[in-house]
């Protein structure tokens, strides 16, 4: 195909728009979804997850995160132009139609559903509330004072699904990990919301940063503390090997550094601090991986 032909240019433009809607160039959301899913897969499988299951969750997570981003932009299409961080998104620039976004969301969800084929029926069943949470989260910002808590539920459903896929049931430790991840998500996404706080106040969007007001930093650190405490409880429940416990001082140090950074409430620093949570996810995965290795 001639790269200068109108058809090629049209297809290239649509592909660029769709990839931007999916945040394909910003993998942080996928990583923050994958880490807790991997924690669960490694714990449930004693460190040896089936490759087909691992691939299904990895690809499915990417696809559902992408679908969530598209429906989020659809839901926020009337607001993104007024927010500094989102003013260049496709809807804000008038580059995409509502029908396109909805069809792209449906297509991505269909592809994600295909990832369930090698998994058991319990996992299929648990995918239904996961899908509901993922697709409805963006609309909670209109009426729910802490939509980041709702996002925490959506971002944590990979945990019971992973246990269901590997073990055929969802044991108590899965729900401890679920609760821990809800708190972690609430912590880092409140920091994310702090970057947009001034704009959100102007347009009337509800976020945890707006709801917590001047206590936003205290709320973030309380959630971080609860997250780490529950990870310690999880370690006690599973009889974690010594390697697991090395994560706690490292994570506490990373959390303190986040506290020191967000005290300024500077927009860019808050955004960079949000990105830094990827390190916490990696540290805990390394600790769980090491636990399963040394526990054998």
Swiss-Prot record:
**Gene3D superfamilies according to UniProt:** UbiA prenyltransferase (1.20.120.1780)
Q: How does it sit in the membrane?
A: Multi-pass membrane protein
Query: InterPro entries, from UniProt?
Result: HB_polyprenyltransferase-like (IPR006370), Prenyltransferase (IPR039653), UbiA_prenyltransferase (IPR000537), UbiA_prenylTrfase_CS (IPR030470), UbiA_sf (IPR044878)
Q: Does the keyword Isomerase apply?
A: no
For this protein, the record's Pfam families field holds: UbiA
> What GO molecular function terms would the record report?
4-hydroxybenzoate polyprenyltransferase activity; transferase activity, transferring alkyl or aryl (other than methyl) groups
Question: Do the record's keywords include Membrane?
Answer: yes
Q: In which pathway does it act?
A: Cofactor biosynthesis; ubiquinone biosynthesis
Catalytic activity, EC: 2.5.1.39
Can you supply one Gene Ontology CC term for this chain's record?
Answer: plasma membrane
Q: What is this protein called?
A: 4-hydroxybenzoate octaprenyltransferase
Q: Which organism is it from?
A: Neisseria meningitidis serogroup B (strain ATCC BAA-335 / MC58)
What would be the name of the gene that encodes this protein? ubiA
């Amino acid at each position: 195909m001639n790269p200068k032909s109108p058809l090629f240019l049209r297809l290239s433009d649509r592909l660029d728009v769709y990839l931007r809607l999916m945040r394909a160039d910003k993998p942080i959301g996928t990583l923050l979804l994958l880490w807790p899913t991997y924690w669960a897969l490694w714990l449930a499988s004693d460190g040896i997850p089936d490759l087909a299951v691992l691939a299904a969750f990895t690809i499915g997570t990417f696809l559902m995160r992408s679908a969530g981003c598209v429906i989020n932009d659809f839901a926020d299409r009337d607001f993104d132009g007024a927010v500094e961080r989102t003013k260049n998104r496709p809807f804000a620039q008038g580059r995409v139609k509502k029908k396109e976004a909805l069809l792209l969301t449906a297509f991505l969800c269909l592809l994600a559903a295909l990832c369930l084929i090698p998994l058991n029926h319990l996992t299929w069943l648990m995918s239904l509330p996961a899908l509901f949470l993922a697709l409805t989260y963006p609309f909670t910002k209109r009426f729910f004072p802490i939509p980041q808590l709702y996002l925490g539920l959506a971002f944590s459903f990979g945990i019971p699904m992973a246990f269901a896929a590997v073990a055929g049931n969802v044991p108590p430790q899965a729900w401890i990990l679920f609760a821990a991840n809800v708190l972690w998500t609430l912590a880092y996404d409140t920091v994310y919301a702090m970057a947009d706080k001034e704009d959100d106040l102007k347009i009337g969007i509800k976020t945890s940063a707006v709801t917590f007001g001047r206590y936003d930093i205290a709320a973030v650190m309380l959630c971080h503390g609860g997250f780490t405490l529950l990870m310690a409880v999880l370690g006690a429940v599973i009889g974690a090997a010594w390697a697991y416990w090395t994560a706690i001082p490292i994570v506490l140090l990373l959390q303190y550094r986040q506290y020191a950074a967000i005290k300024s409430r500077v927009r860019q620093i808050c955004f960079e601090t949000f990105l830094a949570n990827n390190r916490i996810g990696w540290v805990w995965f390394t600790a769980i991986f090491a636990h399963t290795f040394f526990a054998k």
